[in-house]
């Protein structure tokens, strides 16, 4: 081997040794790390692709909207505070600023735990509810000043420029009406059969101390496009459900003092409503479930529409201004009674409360006003009572003369009334004419939100009963408490009945009934609002005072002289044919009875 070859072999050997020592351990490690990273990256990509594939399979073009960040935005005016959520572009919470709940806290008509609402449809056989989608918005909290309107826009882009979901909420500077303008643009090919529902579930929050009275007044009302008002039963502990096949203009979840409702510019095609008892009676009143179908055209969904929500008190002014027929959420009684409430009681009450802050005094002044209004009828009734008082000795003599022969007694009484020129019904007619006003009060006070949480004397709340004693047991038809205003009303009514009976002297069952009726009302009114019992009690007191005042201006001697003159005049005049036939009929009846 020559010298050069030897040197070459030595150099190659040195290079191999150096290469093995410095590079052999590093290269395999680097290769292994690179391979692991590539596998992990590829696995991650596979998982992401699988997740996206599943998401797309479930929600299609709505897939990306199922993930996002929730943003709450507040729209607030002087009456209401509405919290909107970008998660569903929905109403999350509603606070009525002018009212408190029974614990003295701000009254939450709705909140996230009690209510949920949104549009529902199927897309590629997958169920979609907008309250699960995340909308985009750049708007912030807004307090709406006078003569301005707050506005919040939520939108979901769906890929193409002409494909999006949009919901715009607006709130004026005052009032309880929230408007929602919604659009489904470019989605007609992605909604199965063109069917879109609006779903609203509400666990109706408790706001009153007397939860049972509130529960008895809570229901779902709805108003059809043909202007027909309907509702589910109120006084029931059972589940109430109804399927509606007629177009619906609005529906409302109505409580005793507050209502949450929705009105649509394009009537809903149909709907299903359900009301059932709650499983949490201390927290909620009832549970309401409503599903209504939006109008469609040849299996194509409508792309836009307007909803108006009402979240507010059951005051006639606010309800009536919201939508046609919406005032029916305030029950004021049968037609005649309702007209008296609308055009007499409510205007007078509203006028008085502008100047008087104590609602016990408001009721007192209301009684005085009504009594003055009815004074002509009361005067007529009292004159009739005075005439009967003058005739009482003669009537007693007739009863003593004929004993148990009631037919003869009645015949002689008719003859006496005719001779004296007295109409025995003249005292009853004024009383009957006053009955619609008494019935109007019976409907007005239980629904008067103005009395809610207003104290007077020992009653902490005139809108509910004034319990001076809570009993450890339940009395059937009476309750487990004692209402003092109801006792006072009952006592004053019995006293008035006794006073009236001293003049009219009813006999037999009529006398018993006259005393039994106040006792019956004591059982009925024991759980009614204290304001109603107080009104009836004060009304009785003023009736006594009114009669005493009228008595000072009525001369009984003049009444006696008038009756004597009428008797003399009747004796000189021939009997009219009708009166003669009437008397003959009574005589014939008496004769027939005698033959038997």
UniProtKB/Swiss-Prot annotation:
Disulfide partners: none
Protein source organism: Amoebophilus asiaticus (strain 5a2)
NCBIfam families: PRK01318.2-3 (NF002356), yidC_nterm (TIGR03593), yidC_oxa1_cterm (TIGR03592)
Region (Disordered): 565-596
Top-rank lineage group of the source organism: Bacteria
The entry's keywords: Cell inner membrane, Cell membrane, Chaperone, Membrane, Protein transport, Transmembrane, Transmembrane helix, Transport
GO BP: any one term: protein insertion into membrane
Gene3D superfamilies: 2.70.98.90
Principal localisation: membrane
Subcellular location: Cell inner membrane
Self-association state and partner proteins as the record states: Interacts with the Sec translocase complex via SecD. Specifically interacts with transmembrane segments of nascent integral membrane proteins during membrane integration.
Residue ranges, compositional bias (Basic and acidic residues): 565-584
Keyword field contains Signal: no
Record-level GO cellular component terms: plasma membrane
Protein name: Membrane protein insertase YidC
Residues passing through the membrane, by range: 4-24, 332-352, 359-379, 425-445, 468-488, 518-538
A Pfam family assignment: 60KD_IMP
One GO molecular-function entry: membrane insertase activity
Family according to the record: Belongs to the OXA1/ALB3/YidC family. Type 1 subfamily.
Membrane-topology annotation of the record: Multi-pass membrane protein
The protein's role, per its UniProt record: Required for the insertion and/or proper folding and/or complex formation of integral membrane proteins into the membrane. Involved in integration of membrane proteins that insert both dependently and independently of the Sec translocase complex, as well as at least some lipoproteins. Aids folding of multispanning membrane proteins.
